[in-house]
């Protein structure tokens, strides 16, 4: 009996120690903090969507080559970024932007994002429904939900990393565990489809960030959830499809996006936003051509390279691949020029 008790006690201690090490000790806190309810809420179809009618301040400490900064994220009742609190969506907009943090306006006030600048340059009303960590898949889904706003033009800001994000079941995040999102998968017949998120990664992140696991039961259940999230992230990354499948996924989602945009009477402009001056993946222009049906493509890599050659202001945040204030101005100017030339509004 004593031996059995000793075994049970030892096993319990080992289990608790394993949870502590795997779910807490080795999960490093992100080099950022937030004041407010957070920018995202869980969504069963997409995984995460912008938190509507909210205000969150994001705070980033100084690092070796970058000063500390913070920025405010205000959203309207649909989750679109806006300039201040209490704003509601209009019944319709001339222009809608979708994409990831490059379009959302990471590190900037909404008024300084290329979406807001583009609206001012074109004299058009604009709603920015981009979201940090999104790929093409989630952008298409959120776009579809909001096409009742009847935009005349939809601008999708694509980056090279969306090829990976489209097939990842865990979105990029600050934590070493899964932030579950929708993603392209393939059925038994080899046909692509959009699979829903597997679990609630938003709750997992929010509980961990807030430290809301002080009770013994909460500590154990959240710890188990984090361990699952770490294992699931590792498992999915090890099963990542190759480049051919990633290109197939991109074409599949862009076709869906263009089809719903065209059916609504709008036009779709896909804009490639270079990260650290790198141009688009080789497959992207061919994918756009295959999608056809009026889709337009603008590669802004030459504009960024020209700005660099001419000694213009740094279009990137120092120590980061995201566009700076100058970068967003460059993007807005390039898109506005193209839209005017092609008569897209």
Segments the model singles out, each with a brief description of its role:
Residues 4-8, 317-345:
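Histidine-centered active-site loop/cap adjacent to the catalytic His
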Residues 6-22:
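Hydrophobic membrane-insertion alpha-helices, especially the h-region
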Residues 27-121, 214, 304-318, 333:
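Membrane/wall-proximal cationic-aromatic binding patches
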Residues 93, 123-125, 149-154, 262-269, ...:
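Loop/turn elements at helix/coil->beta-strand transitions in domains of secreted/extracellular proteins
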Residues 100, 139, 154, 261, ...:
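Generic structural signal for small/hydrophobic residues in well-ordered secondary structure
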Residues 104-186:
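Conserved SGNH/GDSL esterase-like catalytic core that processes O-acyl groups on lipids
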Residues 136, 140, 247, 251, ...:
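Short, amphipathic alpha-helical "lid/cap" segments that border enzyme active or binding sites
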Residues 159-295, 300-313:
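Serine-dependent acyl-ester chemistry module
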């Amino acid at each position: 009996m004593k031996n059995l008790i000793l075994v049970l006690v030892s096993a319990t201690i080992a289990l608790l120690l394993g949870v502590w090490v795997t779910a807490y000790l080795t999960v490093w806190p992100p080099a950022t903090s937030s004041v407010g309810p957070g920018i995202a809420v869980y969504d069963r179809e997409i995984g995460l969507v912008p938190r509507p009618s909210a205000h969150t301040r994001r705070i980033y400490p100084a690092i070796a080559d970058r000063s500390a900064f913070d920025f405010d994220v205000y959203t309207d009742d649909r989750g679109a970024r806006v300039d201040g609190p209490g704003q509601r969506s209009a019944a319709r907009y001339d222009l809608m932007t979708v994409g990831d943090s490059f379009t959302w306006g990471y590190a900037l006030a909404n008024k300084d994002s290329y979406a807001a600048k583009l609206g001012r340059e074109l004299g058009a009303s604009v709603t920015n429904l981009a979201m940090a960590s999104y790929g093409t898949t989630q952008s298409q889904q959120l776009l579809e939900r909001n096409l009742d706003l009847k935009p005349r033009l939809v601008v999708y800001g694509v980056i090279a990393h969306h090829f990976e994000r489209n097939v990842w079941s865990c979105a990029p995040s600050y934590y070493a565990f899964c932030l579950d999102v929708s993603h392209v998968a393939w059925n038994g017949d080899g046909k692509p489809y959009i699979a829903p998120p597997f679990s609630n990664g938003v709750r997992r992140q929010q509980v961990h960030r807030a430290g809301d696991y002080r009770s013994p039961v909460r500590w154990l259940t959240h710890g188990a959830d984090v361990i699952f999230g770490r294992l699931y992230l590792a498992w999915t990354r090890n099963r990542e499809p190759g480049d051919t499948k990633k290109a197939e996924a991109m074409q599949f989602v862009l076709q869906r996006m263009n089809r719903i945009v065209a059916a609504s009477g709008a036009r779709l402009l896909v804009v490639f936003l270079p990260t650290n001056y790198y141009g688009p993946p080789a497959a992207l222009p061919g994918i756009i051509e295959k999608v056809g049906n009026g889709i337009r493509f603008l590669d802004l890599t030459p504009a960024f390279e020209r700005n660099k050659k001419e000694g213009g202001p740094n279009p990137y945040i120092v120590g980061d691949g995201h566009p700076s204030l100058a970068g967003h101005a460059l993007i807005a100017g390039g898109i506005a020029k193209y839209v005017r030339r092609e008569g897209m509004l």
